[in-house]
């Protein structure tokens, strides 16, 4: 059984929601990524998304774009990230998901990327710019390696939700707003109605992401989903320029507060 399925099964049995956290691999540097993953797992992260830095991240707002650029400026490349995931796997069995742009996979080589991801212990992929028309091909290849292709749906894509989710696995990433990622003070989408629509088409666990910046927002949205995804608000704390031990403490404090409300 894939680690993602196991995790949602355990959480359901405990009556809890998943805390899914996003960080950019290689920001502030690749070795610190290792420390951050272990630190946030320790205080309650259930699934961790590792963003593979990309020069033109269309789905990302300024916080994650800047984070991606910092990692690129450090020279972080896919082989470095594979190596650090392999290192994480010696210490941790937490579900790990790459958030990766399709062009990065294509340039690296689809087969090579999937094989290496499987070998180091990646459980799933979120590909925000994957055209629906090309989804089938990569889905078939990912299946061969036991890697889940996690569907990404948005409030504007009601007529496409069925198509997007029908072959997805793991969980549905439900984008809470139209536009790009980024911490927000409020979310204007009618979340209850939106999640009902998604539930009409799939029984997979559903996690809400984009714009969740505070424990209060997470608490407000948890009743409509099986999990909450927090990215930009966490990346902001990593980027604040603390020394390493202070940064890790700040990140752990934030994640533990989020976990408490779920």
Curated annotation (Swiss-Prot):
SUPFAM superfamilies: Ribulose-phoshate binding barrel. Pathway: Amino-acid biosynthesis; L-tryptophan biosynthesis; L-tryptophan from chorismate: step 5/5. It catalyses: (1S,2R)-1-C-(indol-3-yl)glycerol 3-phosphate + L-serine = D-glyceraldehyde 3-phosphate + L-tryptophan + H2O. GO terms for molecular function: tryptophan synthase activity. It comes from the Bacteria. One of its GO terms (cellular component) is cytosol. The alpha subunit is responsible for the aldol cleavage of indoleglycerol phosphate to indole and glyceraldehyde 3-phosphate. This is Tryptophan synthase alpha chain.
């Amino acid at each position: 059984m894939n680690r993602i399925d196991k995790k949602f099964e355990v959480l359901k049995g405990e009556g809890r929601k998943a805390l899914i956290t996003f960080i950019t691999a290689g920001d502030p540097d690749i070795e610190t990524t290792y420390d951050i993953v272990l630190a946030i797992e320790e205080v309650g992260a259930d699934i961790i998304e590792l963003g593979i830095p990309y020069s033109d991240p269309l789905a990302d707002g300024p916080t994650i774009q800047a984070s991606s650029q910092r990692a690129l400026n450090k020279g972080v490349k896919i082989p470095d990230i594979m190596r650090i995931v392999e290192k994480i796997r010696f210490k941790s069995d937490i579900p790990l998901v790459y958030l990766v742009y399709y062009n990065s996979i294509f340039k690296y080589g689809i087969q090579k990327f999937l094989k290496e991801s499987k070998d180091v212990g990646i459980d799933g992929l979120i590909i925000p710019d994957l055209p629906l028309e090309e989804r089938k091909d990569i889905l078939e290849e990912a299946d061969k390696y036991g890697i889940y292709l996690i569907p990404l749906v948005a409030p504007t894509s009601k007529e496409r939700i069925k198509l997007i989710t029908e072959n997805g696995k793991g969980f549905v990433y439900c984008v809470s707003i139209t536009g790009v990622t980024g911490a927000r003070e409020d979310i204007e989408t009618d979340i209850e109605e939106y999640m009902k629509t998604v539930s009409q088409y799939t029984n997979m666990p559903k996690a809400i992401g984009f714009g969740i910046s505070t424990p209060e927002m997470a608490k407000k949205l948890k009743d409509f989903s099986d999990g909450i995804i927090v990215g930009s608000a966490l990346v902001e704390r990593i980027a604040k320029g603390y020394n390493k031990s202070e940064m890790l403490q700040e990140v752990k404090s934030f994640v533990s507060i989020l976990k408490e409300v779920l």
